[in-house]
Amino acid sequence: MSKQLNPVVPEQPIVLGKMGSTYGIRGWLRVFSSTENAESIFDYQPWFIQQGGKWQHVELEDWKRHSQDLIIKVKGVDDRDAANLLTNCEIVVDSKQLPELEEDDYYWKDLMGCQVVTTAGYELGKIIDMMETGSNDVMVVKANLKDAFGMKERLVPFLHGQVIKNVDLTAQRVEVDWDPGF
């Protein structure tokens, strides 16, 4: 692991994964990827982590698939104790590296915090998380404090054209055709 900030610290940081538990005694770690294809996390370099409030560049020496897991070897991390210090560190890259999307495609990070409003004008709340279900993505919407239906959270499918009627990232607003009682 390099302590120098030679690679430029991300201007627009985005978390692409997390370092998991150690694997073996030679400094290998499990990696949990948030990318659609798990191995795609290795396409985005350089990696950074934050420790003690400071950015640190993480240089990969090697990676491989082991059973269902991805495991990595970080340069300069040669034993289990050193690897343990990296457990639970989020893997961060500069979001400028991410590819441009086609129309009606969105990065989840851009949807976070958007206000979700029905076509009738009812404010359902704000997007606090997204989930992948296999068939479609689902917005986790935290309801407003004075929700007329007593909801705390809603799960709203992200189905463009069916449920999603309009997405305005500039205004941080997603319009949906959805019954507020659900």
UniProtKB/Swiss-Prot annotation:
> What's a Pfam family in this record?
PRC_RimM
Keyword rRNA processing applies: yes
Ordered alphabetically, the record's keywords are:
Chaperone, Cytoplasm, Ribosome biogenesis, rRNA processing
Q: Has keyword NAD?
A: no
Question: Where does the UniProt entry say this protein principally localizes?
Answer: cytoplasm
Q: Which Gene3D superfamilies match?
A: PRC-barrel domain, RimM
Record-level Gene Ontology MF annotations: ribosome binding
InterPro entries named among the record's database cross-references: PRC_barrel-like_sf (IPR011033), PRC_RimM (IPR056792), RimM (IPR011961), RimM_N (IPR002676), RimM_N_sf (IPR036976), Transl_B-barrel_sf (IPR009000)
Q: What biological process terms from GO does the record include?
A: ribosomal small subunit biogenesis; rRNA processing
Give any Gene Ontology cellular component. cytoplasm
Residue limits of the PRC barrel domain?
103-182
Enumerate the subcellular locations listed in this protein's record, separating them with semicolons.
Cytoplasm
| Role noted for this protein | An accessory protein needed during the final step in the assembly of 30S ribosomal subunit, possibly for assembly of the head region. Essential for efficient processing of 16S rRNA. May be needed both before and after RbfA during the maturation of 16S rRNA. It has affinity for free ribosomal 30S subunits but not for 70S ribosomes.
Q: What is known of its domains?
A: The PRC barrel domain binds ribosomal protein uS19.
Question: What family is this protein classified in?
Answer: Belongs to the RimM family.
What is the annotated quaternary arrangement, including any partners? Binds ribosomal protein uS19.
Q: What is this protein called?
A: Ribosome maturation factor RimM
Q: Which organism is it from?
A: Yersinia enterocolitica serotype O:8 / biotype 1B (strain NCTC 13174 / 8081)
